[in-house]
Amino acid sequence: MSKKAYIFLADGFEDIEGLTVVDLLRRAGIDIKTVSIKETTQIQTSHGITMLTDTTFTETSFTDADILVLPGGMPGTKYLAAYKPLTDLLTDFNNKGKKIAAICAAPSVFSGLGFLKDKKATSYPSFMEVIAKDGAQPSEDSVVTDGNITTSRGLGTAIDFALSIIEQLESKEKADEIAESIVYKR
């Protein structure tokens, strides 16, 4: 049975951070669904690209999820942080030790919910102070996994972020295979 992932998209999400994860996880055979937090599946990225998600939050049950993923970008990250049904779901997953992941500005959603207290984490450089104030142990590593939480720095680390998720859900061999297939050196 293939692993199941959901990535949550709001208007203003960072195109590459969101879609790189979707692309690479699908290449790895992981069933990842794009989820709009709006009432409609139409989303506009931070760079003005209009796209349709697979589903909306209210139409979806996440009981089969192996991981929940947040892309960064502004103002998308602010919208994700303000959407209570999502923060409630993330809190439930974190409390159960289930995998959650965020990149760029989005680790601030986790830190704002108290998830990063005393955990090693990373984020976009201008958000490092934010996550540190919320109790995280900031790292400049491209991708950091501490327990059930994975964080990454930004657009330039999106491939490493996606490969880390593949490695966690499938295997290092599968992540290496995907990296080789896209001519990417890990």
Regions inferred by a protein language model and the residue ranges of each:
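Extended, subdomain-level signal for the structured scaffold at the beginning of enzyme domains
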Residues: M1-I100, V109-G112, D118, V130-E140, ...
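Short, thiol/selenol-centered motifs that function as redox-active sites or metal-ligating centers
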Residues: I103-A105
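Short, acidic/turn-prone active-site loops that include or flank metal/cofactor-
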Residues: P125-M128
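Cytochrome P450 catalytic-domain "roof"
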Residues: T145
